[in-house]
Amino acid sequence: MRSKKMTGGLEKAPHRSLLYALGLSKDEVNRPLIGICNAANEIIPGHVHLHTITRAVKDGVRLAGGVPMEFPAIGVCDGLAMNHTGMRYSLPSREIIADSIEIMATAHPFDALVLIPNCDKIVPGMLMAALRLNIPTIVISGGPMLAGRKDGKKVDLITVFEGVGQVKTGNMTEDELTVLEQSACPTCGSCSGMFTANSMNCLSETIGLALPGNGTIPAVMAERTRLAKAAGSQIMTLLEKDIKPRDIVTEKSLKNAVTMDMALGCSTNTVLHLPAIFNEAGLKLDLTVFDEISRNTPNLCKLSPAGPDHIEDLNAAGGIQGVMAELSKTGRIELDPMTVTGKTVGENLKELNAGVKDHKIVRPVDDPYSTEGGIAVLFGNIAEDGCVVKQSAVAPEMMKRTCNAKVFNSEEEAVEAILGNQIVKGDAVVILYEGPKGGPGMREMLTPTSAIAGMGLGADVALITDGRFSGGTRGAAIGHVSPEAASGGAIGLVQTGDVIEIDIPGRSINVKLDEAEMEKRRAEFKPIEKEMPSAFLKRYSQNVTSASTGAIYKK
């Protein structure tokens, strides 16, 4: 066992003495030691209940003969960090989480790991660590929040963000907004739509590093606790069979992940996280792969923000296994990859008798919402390395549109202009210097996109940025523009008054300038150098790569 590095032999008597100080018995010291990484804290609604999940995991480990040993992980709530300097720390926290788990599991050589995340950057950070360490590992998330209810309709956090814009336009009173904000998030759990956290939890299940049900069983259900107990027991089986993350994460599981990403209509943040995760397994996933698979994958779901349904509805409709079964009817799912059940994807689908139970929530594969996937990748003279848009959440009027650029050098400047009624129909709000390097930290632009939607401009105004978006963003929100402005990217050459041509079906985005004018501006262009708010963010800015490669660290 790996733990024998610290428990076995004469020379390890001092190590055993320290373990006895924890209250362990001699029998426990000689059993498999299972690291339990618990990301619980009291500030994130998606993590406030993870101690309950952790207790169930520990029970499962003990039932199967192991010794659970808990250690913590940090986490950032993107909703609470939104629209202030705290958002600069969200994406960088992904690398810190991966690094800290590597440190803990190497300094203390556990035999296996159970990872307990739930929200946006914690899930990919833990998956990156799992593949980097490559010891038997299983992921069990905290589960999604239930949707709220107001006036007989389902509401969620994005409803509140958009409510701010509605108040600004006089379409909602502040008293109504107060009722809404107290109704939208009724339980613990990751925010209830197909936002980033739930996107990543669903894809963890798809990839095979989490048990069936992990992506969709609500946080408040007893079934979630039972799943956690099962995960604790199953890690002992994975240890016994020596099934490791890189046995599970292969080229075929990569294809499954991107296919499900497109069918479900997941967050554009998956285009950052999946390349970073697969990179740890030595697999390359670039934007062209996303686009190729998107063109050949039907979009079967329109969950919030694209539609009125939520993760609880997807769970009742058959969950992730149901969607995979539906896609497998046309050969779009690889059935061979191993999973943490100890069985292949195909064996899981057969054993569970998986299928879609409600075709109002998950459309039939031969009658999809669209014949293409939820995310499109665009290229052009302002995005030579690409940019992304959640096309499943774009109004038909904005799929192909010519817009007038209004350029801002920060999110704050753009929000002030939007809420100050300076943006009109036909505009493209262009926000520069919000990329991984230039932000630094690649902040989410949920506040400006929600303001645009809430003010009734979602079908007439685009937002283009080298920053990124919340999974709750809807509308013509085109992000991850690469190269970013801070790296000298052509997006930085765009000026207010320029005409931008957006063609999502044609996969292009261009500023309408001749090459001579582009070269003239390029020769005169000097990227703005921001004063770094901290030494940590300065180090991050110096070491992070482009959004087009997953915003991972330089080698």
Swiss-Prot record:
Signal peptide range: none
Keywords on record: 2Fe-2S, Amino-acid biosynthesis, Branched-chain amino acid biosynthesis, Iron, Iron-sulfur, Lyase, Magnesium, Metal-binding
The keyword Lyase is assigned to this record: yes
Binding site for Mg(2+): D78, D120, K121, E444
Annotated catalysed reactions: (2R)-2,3-dihydroxy-3-methylbutanoate = 3-methyl-2-oxobutanoate + H2O; (2R,3R)-2,3-dihydroxy-3-methylpentanoate = (S)-3-methyl-2-oxopentanoate + H2O
Cofactors, names only: [2Fe-2S] cluster; Mg(2+)
Catalytic site positions: S470 (proton acceptor)
Cellular-component GO terms for this entry: cytosol
Residues that hold [2Fe-2S] cluster according to the record: C119, C191
BP GO annotations: isoleucine biosynthetic process; L-valine biosynthetic process
Listed EC numbers: 4.2.1.9
UniProt superkingdom: Bacteria
Annotated positions of the N6-carboxylysine modification: K121
Pathway the protein acts in: Amino-acid biosynthesis; L-isoleucine biosynthesis; L-isoleucine from 2-oxobutanoate: step 3/4; Amino-acid biosynthesis; L-valine biosynthesis; L-valine from pyruvate: step 3/4
Cofactor note: Binds 1 [2Fe-2S] cluster per subunit. This cluster acts as a Lewis acid cofactor.
Gene Ontology molecular function terms on file: 2 iron, 2 sulfur cluster binding; dihydroxy-acid dehydratase activity; magnesium ion binding
Quaternary structure, from the entry: Homodimer.
NCBIfam families with a match to the protein in the record: ilvD (TIGR00110), PRK00911.1 (NF002068)
Record family assignment: Belongs to the IlvD/Edd family.
Function according to Swiss-Prot or TrEMBL: Functions in the biosynthesis of branched-chain amino acids. Catalyzes the dehydration of (2R,3R)-2,3-dihydroxy-3-methylpentanoate (2,3-dihydroxy-3-methylvalerate) into 2-oxo-3-methylpentanoate (2-oxo-3-methylvalerate) and of (2R)-2,3-dihydroxy-3-methylbutanoate (2,3-dihydroxyisovalerate) into 2-oxo-3-methylbutanoate (2-oxoisovalerate), the penultimate precursor to L-isoleucine and L-valine, respectively.
UniProt-recorded name of the protein: Dihydroxy-acid dehydratase
Protein source organism: Maridesulfovibrio salexigens (strain ATCC 14822 / DSM 2638 / NCIMB 8403 / VKM B-1763)
